[in-house]
Curated annotation (Swiss-Prot):
Subcellular location: Nucleus
Stated name of the protein: DNA-directed RNA polymerase III subunit RPC-3
Lineage: Eukaryota, Fungi, Dikarya, Ascomycota, Pezizomycotina
Record note on quaternary structure: Component of the RNA polymerase III (Pol III) complex consisting of 17 subunits.
Source organism per UniProt: Coccidioides immitis (strain RS) (Valley fever fungus)
BP-aspect Gene Ontology terms: DNA-templated transcription
Location of the region described as Leucine-zipper in the Swiss-Prot/TrEMBL record: 580-601
Length: 653
């Protein structure tokens, strides 16, 4: 754990929960696994305060705990990744609001504040009931108020779950809704919204193994694998490989928090997208089939329908257990945010229509992709194996696209009048009500969709891959290649901003050719020797390129030594991540300093009689100062959100 990452986690926990919890967390982060008496001794806190703080940190999944079977002592360990995820709370709330509406965002905001909660408790909260609208604050950083941590988690704690007040980063009111968007059904019950969130995978069931560190879970699984007898007769490396494989399967099974595999994820996805496209509460609801092994196998009962009126209805779903304990699934949100980034990249490389086709493909893949990577720790570049997503049938993608989308208008050689390959004056049914045969004047809709995806699959992008399965055209995505492409684009953007376009050329040459001496590098990059040396010196001093000395003989004389330049993308990536942690910490520290300068004014604006009536109770000078402060805070928080995007690309995707 680096210095700046620890500093950032401490600032985030302090701003969200208070200094008591940050003190306990940073002690565990610096000293590793510790029992309760040692925490009390070294933090100079009372046992009651430590138990109180650990109870809240455990409920927020910021601290792991494990009781040893040998001595019965409970050890606590910090979870720094969960602490860092606090910075993405605003993005998570905004994403849920865009897809499922304000009430779903309110539920997710409540879960983020509580850490985890029973479904029955969420259903009992007045602010989450139909007809009660509260502003959902999301700024890309936090957007969550820490409240009173009540006994709602179903886990026995030694102390009452009470949290300090948490400062909300957002000061500008609720987030604006997207154009043309309205909540599809403001009367939906909490149970229905939770089913929608579960279908997207945005919430997950809390299991006992989620409170233990991955190392403890693996050790327990390894002991179970040794005792089951499946490895009888194996020795040496084969025995070790077999035990490791069985242990990983057990850990995956123990930590699988999917609420239900029978939820109609594909049908729900189509229903939500259509509700976002048009607010039609009177549309007939059709019974949706449950998912099979592949989500693209889900079809309507009447194959002739185009799903345009499909909607989600709670009666078709199994009700969630009221005693189930749930929490926010950060890993699934990372998948959704990665897909959003890929859609933006596809939009830059193609047309808006092509990016919409790609968005539809990724939306079907997303519901079946639980995590961005199988292993949390980053694998060195060049050692990662290919990771293909599930394959989605071409006709499924075509059926889910907007029927009014002009697929032919941006493809050369296709007559724009034949949009989707169907005559404009043709009806779906004849006068007797029976289906008629389509007289196509142009390419079919499936062909046009296939052309858009083929454009994305071509070099050098490789956004998707075409496959044939059982005689059907399917499309998949190779995520590891795209994640590598995103990382390289971000690093090249940083290098160009700091050293210019010629530096990007040098980096690309070194990445493609490996180690090169200055003369050979000059020949390939087509640069003057003076300019090349100047740029190499600047990049070497900043740590972006390195120089290796290879002596020609044992004397090691400078005249008999080769100097080879090389570029290590993994080292540069980790260096940039550390610098980003430092920049984020400095932004949050600056916010605290500026807030301290205006302490009395901000305390005045937080009064219940002043909040919302600033024009009445504040003077003109105070209003101007408050406006300047909010602009400054918005600027700094926006910078933190932008830096978090960089960390996500370089570390998580």
């Amino acid at each position: 754990m680096s210095q700046y990452a620890a500093e950032l986690c401490k600032l985030l926990i302090t701003d969200n929960f208070g200094e008591l919890y940050a003190l306990i967390f940073i002690y565990l982060l610096n000293h590793g696994r510790q029992p309760l008496p040692r925490i009390v001794q070294n933090t100079h806190l009372s046992p009651r305060q430590v138990r109180h703080g650990l109870a809240v940190l455990v409920q927020q999944h910021l601290v792991f705990h494990c009781t040893s079977l040998d001595d019965g002592i409970t050890y606590y360990e910090s979870n720094w990744r969960s602490a860092y995820n606090l910075v993405r709370s605003g993005k998570i709330i905004q994403l849920v609001e865009e897809r499922l509406g304000n009430r779903a965002a309110s539920i997710v905001s409540t879960l983020l504040a509580l850490g985890h909660a029973k479904i029955s408790y969420l259903e009992s909260l007045p602010e989450l009931q139909p007809g009660h609208e509260r502003p959902v604050k999301a700024n890309g950083i936090n957007g969550v108020h820490g409240g009173e941590g009540e006994d709602v988690n179903g886990v026995d704690n030694d102390a009452e779950n009470h949290t300090d007040h948490a400062h909300d980063y957002q000061q500008d009111g609720p987030v604006r809704e997207p154009n043309g968007y309205h909540d599809s059904d403001p009367g939906l019950q909490v149970q229905t919204i939770l089913q929608q969130l579960a279908a997207f995978g945005f919430i997950t069931r809390v299991r006992n193994q989620h409170f233990q560190s991955p190392e403890d879970n693996f050790d327990a699984a390894l002991k179970a694998a040794k005792s089951n007898g499946d490895s009888y007769g194996l020795k040496g490396n084969k025995l070790e490989a077999k035990l490791t494989e069985d242990a990983e399967k057990l850990v995956k099974e123990w930590t699988d928090g999917r609420i239900s595999r029978a939820l109609p994820s594909a049908s729900l996805l189509r229903g939500v997208k259509r509700r976002l496209r048009k607010d039609d509460s009177s549309a007939p609801r059709k019974r949706l089939k449950l998912d099979g092994p592949l989500e693209d196998d889900v079809k309507d009962e009447d194959d002739g329908d185009d799903f345009s009126d499909d909607d989600y209805h709670n009666d078709e779903m199994a009700a969630l257990d009221p005693n189930m304990v749930i929490r926010v699934n950060y890993e699934k949100f990372n998948v959704a945010l990665r897909n959003r980034r890929l859609i933006e990249l596809a939009d830059q490389n193609g047309s808006a229509v092509t990016s919409q086709v790609y968005e539809t493909l990724l939306s079907h893949i997303e519901v079946q992709t639980p995590t961005c990577r199988e292993h949390v720790e980053a694998i060195p570049e060049g050692e990662e194996a290919e990771q293909y997503s599930v394959s989605i049938r071409l006709d499924t993608i075509s059926r889910d696209l907007d029927i009014d989308l002009d697929l032919a208008g941006v493809i050369a050689g296709i007559i724009p009048d034949n949009i989707n390959g169907i005559k404009e004056d043709e009806d779906d049914e004849d006068e007797e009500g029976g289906p008629v045969s389509m007289k196509r004047r142009g390419p079919s809709r499936n062909y046009l969709v296939d052309q858009h995806l083929s454009f994305l699959a071509a070099e050098p992008s490789f956004f998707c891959t075409r496959r044939m399965q059982a005689g059907m055209i399917t499309w998949a995505v190779e995520y590891r290649h795209l994640a590598k492409k995103l990382r390289h684009l971000e690093l090249e953007r940083l290098i160009e901003a700091r050293f210019g376009g010629f530096a990007v050329r040098i980096v690309r040459v070194l990445a493609a050719k490996g180690k090169l001496d200055e003369k050979r590098l000059q020949e390939i990059s087509l640069m003057a020797s003076k300019d090349l040396r100047q740029i190499l010196g600047q990049m070497a001093s900043a740590g972006f390129v390195e120089l290796q000395e290879v002596p020609r003989d044992a004397q090691r004389q400078p005249s008999r030594t080769m100097y080879l330049w090389f570029y290590d993308p993994d080292r540069v990536r980790f260096m940039v991540i550390e610098d980003t942690y430092k920049s984020m910490s400095r932004c949050l520290q600056r916010i605290r300093v500026e807030r301290e300068k205006l302490k009395f004014l901000l305390e005045k604006t937080e009064r219940s009689d002043v909040k919302g009536n600033e024009d009445r109770y504040l003077s003109a000078a105070e209003l101007q100062t408050l406006k300047e402060w909010r602009d400054t805070e918005k600027l700094l928080l926006g910078e933190v959100a932008r830096l978090d995007e960089l960390v996500a690309v370089l570390r998580d995707y």
